[in-house]
UniProtKB/Swiss-Prot annotation:
Protein name: DNA repair protein RecO
Coiled-coil parts of chain: none
Keyword DNA damage: yes
Role summary: Involved in DNA repair and RecF pathway recombination.
One Pfam family from the record: RecO_N
Annotated GO biological process: DNA recombination; double-strand break repair
SUPFAM superfamilies attached to this UniProt entry: ArfGap/RecO-like zinc finger, Nucleic acid-binding proteins
Organism superkingdom: Bacteria
Keywords: DNA damage, DNA recombination, DNA repair
Organism: Acidovorax sp. (strain JS42)
Gene Ontology cellular component annotations, sorted alphabetically: bacterial nucleoid
Family: Belongs to the RecO family.
Family annotation (NCBIfam families): reco
Keyword Manganese appears in the UniProt entry: no
Length: 262
């Protein structure tokens, strides 16, 4: 029986590693099939048509057959073309994109479809490609990352509702302070909490996440928040992500922290 063939599938390369002297294993994020592992035979050869194409943060169209190389979860790449649209992000935007790739690798199960998340990711990558990390648009990175983090956590069921206390389901009071804690979800803040937001701020984020255009609405809500609010949201989301990603620390996050010390 001929192997089933998936043709012209929208995809991004999240990561690649050596399979043999001449071949690579690609971890890809596809629109209709989620995170898919592909073997790209001969991709490391100087004459391979794959070499200039199989790059991270570039929109691709891939064709592959299921169950390549005798491994059920690793499929055989047959073709890949650049889908066009934007150039590779650079500088801080490139690091930010690689950070998002690492989150997807750590948090998405293999071949679990997340088409809305794919579309959001594609939009974020387009934004990153337009950011001048040394120019006036550099400040756009933080709300872009926070918005994607929120949407990723919600898509895979790891974000509690932001309109009620997680353990009691009691509605939030707009003026009270609440902390998002990995082990307990959203709860009233205590003095020991490193960061917290007001009930009104959490409710605004929940409202944005419930909008039909949720990425745009969430981005607007975060971009217009005052600096202390954005900083506290970042602290809480990073703790939640690290909790679910496990140890060690995300490599791209560690690299960004190291560069900030230079």
């Amino acid at each position: 029986m001929a192997a089933r063939r998936i043709a012209d599938e929208p995809a991004y390369v999240l990561h690649s590693y050596d399979w043999s002297e001449s071949s690579l294993i690609l971890e890809t994020f596809t629109r209709h099939y989620g995170r898919v592992a592909l073997v790209a035979k001969g991709a490391k050869k100087p004459t391979s048509n794959f070499r200039p194409v199989l790059l991270p943060l570039q929109p691709l169209r891939v064709t592959y057959t299921l169950g390549g190389e005798g491994h059920g979860e690793i499929h055989a790449l047959k073709g890949a073309e650049w889908a066009g649209g934007h150039v590779m992000p650079t500088g801080d935007a490139l690091l930010s994109g690689l950070y998002l790739n690492e989150l997807l690798l750590r948090l998405l199960a293999r071949e679990d479809t997340h088409a809305p998340l794919f579309d959001t990711y594609a939009g974020v990558v387009r934004v990153l490609a337009t950011v001048d990390h040394e120019g006036e648009h550099g400040d756009a990175l933080e709300p872009v990352l926070r918005s994607f983090e929120l949407l990723l956590l919600r898509e895979i069921g790891l974000l509690p509702g932001l309109d009620a206390e997680t353990s009691t389901l009691a509605p939030l009071h707009a003026a009270a302070r609440y902390a998002l804690v990995p082990e307990a979800g959203l709860r009233p803040a205590v003095p020991a909490d490193r960061a917290a937001l007001s009930g009104g701020q959490w409710l605004a984020l929940q409202g944005a996440l419930d909008e039909p255009a949720r990425y745009t609405a969430t981005l607007r809500a975060i971009a217009t928040a005052e600096a202390p609010v954005a900083a506290d949201l970042k602290t809480q989301l990073r703790a939640l992500l690290q909790y679910h990603c496990g140890s060690p620390l995300l490599r791209t996050r560690q690299l960004m922290m190291d560069l900030q010390k230079l």
